[in-house]
Amino acid sequence: MTQSNPNEQNVELNRTSLYWGLLLIFVLAVSFSNYFFN
């Protein structure tokens, strides 16, 4: 039981980092599209 908790926390951290990475890529894509269209 004690070993499953850190593993679950690591999975949650990986999910949050993945979501932040996707959000960052989305923002960069929008900024680049605005730059090229302008």
Swiss-Prot record:
Task: Read off the InterPro entries from this record.
Answer: PSII_PsbL, PSII_PsbL_sf
Tell me which SUPFAM superfamilies the record gives: Photosystem II reaction center protein L, PsbL
The UniProt function text for this chain reads: One of the components of the core complex of photosystem II (PSII). PSII is a light-driven water:plastoquinone oxidoreductase that uses light energy to abstract electrons from H(2)O, generating O(2) and a proton gradient subsequently used for ATP formation. It consists of a core antenna complex that captures photons, and an electron transfer chain that converts photonic excitation into a charge separation. This subunit is found at the monomer-monomer interface and is required for correct PSII assembly and/or dimerization.
UniProt xrefs under HAMAP family: PSII_PsbL
Please give the name of this protein.
Photosystem II reaction center protein L
Topology in the lipid bilayer = Single-pass membrane protein
Question: Which family does the UniProt entry place this protein in?
Answer: Belongs to the PsbL family.
GO cellular component labels: chloroplast thylakoid membrane; photosystem II reaction center
UniProt entry keywords in alphabetical sequence? Chloroplast, Membrane, Photosynthesis, Photosystem II, Plastid, Reaction center, Thylakoid, Transmembrane, Transmembrane helix
Report the domain of life of the source organism.
Eukaryota
Gene Ontology BP annotations: photosynthesis
- Please give the start and end residues of each transmembrane region: 17-37
